[in-house]
Regions:
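ASCE RecA-like P-loop NTPase motor cores
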Residues: 1-359
């Protein structure tokens, strides 16, 4: 019983009123649709894994992924020791095929630190755009830029569009700018409400509405990706050879896709070769500390340290770096692939953060 938490959540969605001309509008205070959800959350992943690896389950279970490390913490969460382990080197020559670095200061001297307080400042948002403009001039073809949340992504892009930086970035780089549509978040991004509010995608209680909204989200994502790939192909076609950038005089020199960590773009889509010659990660993708799932999981782990569980803080930190590993892996999809990885946050320069970064 101690592995579960019973949670009651109440969410609201503004009620819309229809006008005589067929239009609809939302009236503040006029009424809100409320939905109540009763959930039983299992906070111990070992409960589910026991069905696979328990005494009466499979005789052999093999887990393979590029983001399982550190293996001790993974084994702790699943409650299995895994007596046979292997951490293989990457299939690419990291010294020759990858350039990776962390940047803590923008071109005009602004501190690049994606904490809530700093990220709300215009100086941060503007210099992040200035830095991205410089990087995308040098990185050929396709560039992926990952933000820790939709809220920060929306805030930054709104600022860039209002100041003209969005258009200036396109003009300076010759790259078309694209943004991942909302509703594609997974994991804690989806549960926290950071990606579109707790009533987003049809509300928590609306089964059919939720399904229709997800279908629409998928269609929007597919349409956006088709345009992104088309822009990259145009750039590759203009290049003197596949590994070279398009000429600076060519009007179509690639594309930039702004997306969120833990979204479909960062975890579920393959961007091989020219589709991702560079990956930029903005900030450190910690889960939303105010999300109830995160809060309860941290408490649960703190209570279970004596049983060999990670502490709540250790678990919380590793969620960020596993998500980071998924995102940066978008630019290295096979042994002949190559690309640049830029971590746009001064915290990545600290020793206590560097030791968590992938090899």
């Amino acid at each position: 019983v101690h592995d579960y938490r019973l949670v009651v959540q109440k969410s609201f969605k503004e009620a819309s009123s229809s006008g005589g001309d067929g239009s609809s509008s939302s009236q503040a205070g006029a009424g809100r649709d409320a939905s109540v959800t009763l959930s039983l959350w299992a906070l111990n992943p070992a409960l589910a894994f026991d069905d696979l690896a328990g005494a009466n389950a499979a005789r052999c279970v093999v887990l393979t992924s590029g983001t399982l490390a550190p293996l001790n913490s993974f084994a702790s969460e699943l409650g299995v020791q895994f007596p046979i382990r292997m951490e293989a080197p990457h299939c690419v020559d990291v010294g020759k095929q990858v350039w990776a670095g962390a940047v803590g200061v923008g071109p005009r001297g602004a501190q690049l630190c994606g904490t809530f307080k700093v990220a709300a400042e215009f100086a941060y948002q503007d210099d992040l755009g200035n830095a991205l403009k410089e990087w995308c001039v040098d990185i050929p073809h396709g560039v992926l830029v990952f933000f820790p949340s939709y809220s920060l992504l929306d805030r930054v892009t709104s600022r860039w569009k209002s100041t003209g930086l969005w258009k200036a970035l396109e003009q300076a780089t010759g790259k078309k700018m694209f943004q991942e549509p909302r509703g594609n978040e997974r994991g804690f991004e989806a549960s926290s409400g950071r990606g579109g509010g707790r009533g987003g995608r049809g509300g928590r209680g609306g089964g059919r509405g939720r399904g229709l909204a997800q279908s629409g989200d998928t269609n929007a994502l597919d349409a956006m990706l088709a345009k992104y790939y088309r822009a990259v192909r145009a750039s590759v076609s203009a290049a003197p050879h596949p590994h070279a950038p398009a000429p600076a005089s060519h009007p179509a020199r690639g594309a930039v896709l702004l997306a969120v960590v833990r979204g479909k773009v960062s975890e579920g889509i393959d961007f091989a070769d020219a589709n991702a010659r560079g990956v930029v990660v903005v900030g450190v993708p910690y889960p939303n500390v105010k999300d109830k799932r995160v809060e309860l999981k941290r408490q649960y782990n703190n209570e279970g340290v004596s049983r060999g569980l990670l502490s709540g803080d250790q678990w919380y930190s590793q969620q960020a770096f596993r998500a980071l590993n998924q995102a940066v892996g978008r630019c290295l999809r096979h042994r002949n692939d190559h690309g640049a990885i830029l971590l746009a946050d001064e915290r990545y320069l600290r020793d206590d953060m560097t030791r968590h970064l992938p090899k």
